[in-house]
């Protein structure tokens, strides 16, 4: 039997007290009674997606110098110093690898909040202006043998509370309500370890999960329903390691895995089941889950494990264990489902990056990409330029452990690295004041959230 709730090991209540109330998540100070009435009206009307700030469209116009179908444009390993970063702080969580780290881009009220997954713990921090980290909440799963590999932020569609979804080796997806500091629900269905979870940007109740059982599952976090399963004759033939929703095409996503392929899937013909999942009142096991066996396109762009993939407009970024990230354009054959061609456009070299399960990340606007390597270095690329431009190479003499995953802040002014030795490394832009792309402060949390004197976690320079 899975544990009924996640045990909260430690919490700074002077930091999280406001987070746990409806004041920050749902209302302005002093208007709780009004909002309570509104919430009751919403419940009567039925659940709907929360009104969250929309993601801007990613504008990409990359034209290789050699032209399509010709030699791939490869970036030079010469830092341009367009943005210079300095190592700021180190925070050691323990001696276990940190497999996942991510900022909250779903809810702009918490744009400076990030979470990590290590061992059987999921820990939430805030990036402080002084360069340190503020510990907000720490959840420890009751299963001591659990090892979390992935996490993703989402939001409650009823009261807009921040939710954190995490999963790993024990095959169960945990949905944690960060406002109530309790486990909201557990999603069961996968037959193997879960390697990645992604949240739909415009429909945050929808998440997809990639598993060792060779399947991808689409879930409705609000109702706890497994809507669709993507596996079968045309599916992956080994562990699925990464997934990502298309930024503008609602029913499209990409997946990749140990079978060396990247697959593009469509759920448009089954969208009626997605809509049905929002109003389902029966037991989740009674929902008519559908299986999709054939992708729109299967691309053999790499010759080894593909452990990370992300959309860049209509293009795809994907990484294997061959010391590089590739940018390519998928061209599905509309007359022959599952077939088509690809044009590999650009190559972003990442020296000494031969380990698998090392993932890259981008800022909110997908302007820059950060990827770690085996030696504790992070390469920061200007991802939308052609030819690719290396912005900076981040290193620290003390950081020698592989960087499993990176997290780039909203505007790219802060870059975090999660290391194999249990350390979080932070680099900050030398002149962050020059950046003008931070989210509107009117959308930020009310004063006092994470701003208390006890918020500054001990950090080593």
UniProtKB/Swiss-Prot annotation:
Keyword RNA-binding: no
Compositional bias segments (type: Basic and acidic residues): 38-47
Gene Ontology cellular component annotations, sorted alphabetically: ESC/E(Z) complex
Region of interest (Disordered), residue spans: 1-56, 429-461
SMART domains on file: WD40
Entries under PROSITE patterns matching the protein: WD_REPEATS_1, WD_REPEATS_2, WD_REPEATS_REGION
WD repeats, residue ranges: 143-186, 189-229, 235-275, 301-338, 351-391, 398-437
Database matches in Pfam families: WD40 (PF00400)
Tissue distribution: Specifically expressed in kernel starting from 6 days after pollination.
Keyword presence, Repressor: yes
Composition bias type Basic residues, residue spans: 1-11
Biased composition (Low complexity): 432-448
Cell compartments where the protein resides: Nucleus
GO BP of this protein: heterochromatin formation; negative regulation of transcription by RNA polymerase II
Annotated Polar residues bias: 18-37
Keywords (A to Z) from UniProt: Chromatin regulator, Developmental protein, Nucleus, Repeat, Repressor, Transcription, Transcription regulation, WD repeat
Function of the protein: Polycomb group (PcG) protein. PcG proteins act by forming multiprotein complexes, which are required to maintain the transcriptionally repressive state of homeotic genes throughout development. PcG proteins are not required to initiate repression, but to maintain it during later stages of development. They probably act via the methylation of histones, rendering chromatin heritably changed in its expressibility.
Family listed: Belongs to the WD repeat ESC family.
Protein's name according to its UniProt entry: Polycomb group protein FIE1
Organism: Zea mays
């Amino acid at each position: 039997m899975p544990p009924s709730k996640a045990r909260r090991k430690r919490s700074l209540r002077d930091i999280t007290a406001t987070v746990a109330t409806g004041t920050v998540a749902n209302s302005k100070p002093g208007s709780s009674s009004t909002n309570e009435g509104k919430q009751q009206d919403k419940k009567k009307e039925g659940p709907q997606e929360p009104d969250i700030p929309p993601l801007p469209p990613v504008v990409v116009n990359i034209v290789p110098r050699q032209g399509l179908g010709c030699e791939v444009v490869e970036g030079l390993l010469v830092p341009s110093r367009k943005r210079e970063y300095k190592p700021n702080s180190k925070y050691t969580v323990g001696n276990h690898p940190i497999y996942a780290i991510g900022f909250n881009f779903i809810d702009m009220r918490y744009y400076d909040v990030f979470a990590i997954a290590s061992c059987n713990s999921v820990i939430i921090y805030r990036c402080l202006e002084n360069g340190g980290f503020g510990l907000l909440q720490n959840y420890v799963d009751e299963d001591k043998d659990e090892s979390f590999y992935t996490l993703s932020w989402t939001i409650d569609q009823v009261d807009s509370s921040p939710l954190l979804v995490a999963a790993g080796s024990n095959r169960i997806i945990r949905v944690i309500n960060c406002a109530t500091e309790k486990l909201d629900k557990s999603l069961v269905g996968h037959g193997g370890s879960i390697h990645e979870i992604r949240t739909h940007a415009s429909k945050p109740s929808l998440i997809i999960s990639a598993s060792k059982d060779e399947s991808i599952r689409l879930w409705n976090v609000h109702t706890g329903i497994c809507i669709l399963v993507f596996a079968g004759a045309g599916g992956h033939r080994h562990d699925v390691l990464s997934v990502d929703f298309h930024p503008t095409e609602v029913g499209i996503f990409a997946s990749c895995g140990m079978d060396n392929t990247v697959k593009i899937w469509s759920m448009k013909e089954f969208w009626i089941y997605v809509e049905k999942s929002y109003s389902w009142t029966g037991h989740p096991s009674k929902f008519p889950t559908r299986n999709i066996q054939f992708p729109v396109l299967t691309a053999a762009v790499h010759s080894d494990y593909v452990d990370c993939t992300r959309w860049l407009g209509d293009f795809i970024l994907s990484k294997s264990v061959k010391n590089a990230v590739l940018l390519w354009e998928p061209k599905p054959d509309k007359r022959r489902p599952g077939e088509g061609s690809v044009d590999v456009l650009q190559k972003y070299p990442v020296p000494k990056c031969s380990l698998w399960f090392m993932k890259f990340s981008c800022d909110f606007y997908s302007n820059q990409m950060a990827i770690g390597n085996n030696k504790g270095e992070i390469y920061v690329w200007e991802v939308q330029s052609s030819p690719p431009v290396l912005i900076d190479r981040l290193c620290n003499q003390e950081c020698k452990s592989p960087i499993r995953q990176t997290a780039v802040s909203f505007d790219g002014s802060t870059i975090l690295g999660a290391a194999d030795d249990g350390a979080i490394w932070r680099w900050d832009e030398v002149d962050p004041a020059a950046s003008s792309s931070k989210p509107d402060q009117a959308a930020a949390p009310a004063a006092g959230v994470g701003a208390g004197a006890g918020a500054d976690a001990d950090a080593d320079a």
